[in-house]
């Protein structure tokens, strides 16, 4: 956002739609552990990695429309990484998801990995991810998770350090943030919880935005 470019010519490559997909949902105690694991998950060549923190997960559990979708969650994770793989057969996808699960256990990333080959089960996960924004905005009170530092993008290898520093800035302003987004490419939707119904809240938003702008430049 805010990037301007002029394109005079562009060639777009088309690829076949995958015959099958599978998910590995890796559970973590907090958003930092999830961020640290991304660089190692990328070694498995997934088609995508999406991140959701406890704000999204808890509100999904409390939602009448999504509570039944939450069977893929084990325990009370602080964050999950939804890792998607493409494949041509169930055998191929079983091997890929099992390799991910074994690697996460070997490296000590997360406390559980739930593998999913069933299409309906995968659709339940994506429904939670898709509806995350609406659920976040339903937070009670004047303070809401606001999109004024959306789409910060960093090298996935450095995501753990970036998220820790981002969180430090937010907490120094006596608030918290909701995290979700496209972890595989280092592009996160991080929404600090701020009220715009007071001058203090507006000042807080501006201050956080200034500090996050400087932080992104460091990375």
Regions of interest found by a model, annotated:
Residues 1-219:
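Noncatalytic alpha-helical scaffold of FAD-dependent oxidoreductases
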